[in-house]
């Protein structure tokens, strides 16, 4: 356990940030899962709608630094490609 006041404060800050980041990552995964489920059920309209909702969430998560911008770009690219396979 930390003994210095500043170290104790840092631990508290890190716990708060960790919880916030975990929540954002979990939300992100949920939106990505919705797109994949819509594609698996072969529902093009639902897949496109889910993708349009997921893309801003992915971008915002990258902007906040929770995931790397290349990771976000790759996710958007792969999901778009997946939705486009429905024709």
UniProtKB/Swiss-Prot annotation:
Gene3D superfamilies: Ribosomal protein S20. InterPro entries: Ribosomal_bS20, Ribosomal_bS20_sf. Residues 1-11 have a biased composition (Basic residues). GO terms for cellular component: cytosol; small ribosomal subunit. One of its GO terms (biological process) is translation. Keywords: Ribonucleoprotein, Ribosomal protein, RNA-binding, rRNA-binding. Residues 1-26 are annotated as: Disordered. It comes from the Bacteria. GO terms for molecular function: small ribosomal subunit rRNA binding; structural constituent of ribosome. Pfam families: Ribosomal_S20p (PF01649). HAMAP family: Ribosomal_bS20. Binds directly to 16S ribosomal RNA. Belongs to the bacterial ribosomal protein bS20 family. NCBIfam families: S20. This is Small ribosomal subunit protein bS20. It comes from Trichlorobacter lovleyi (strain ATCC BAA-1151 / DSM 17278 / SZ).
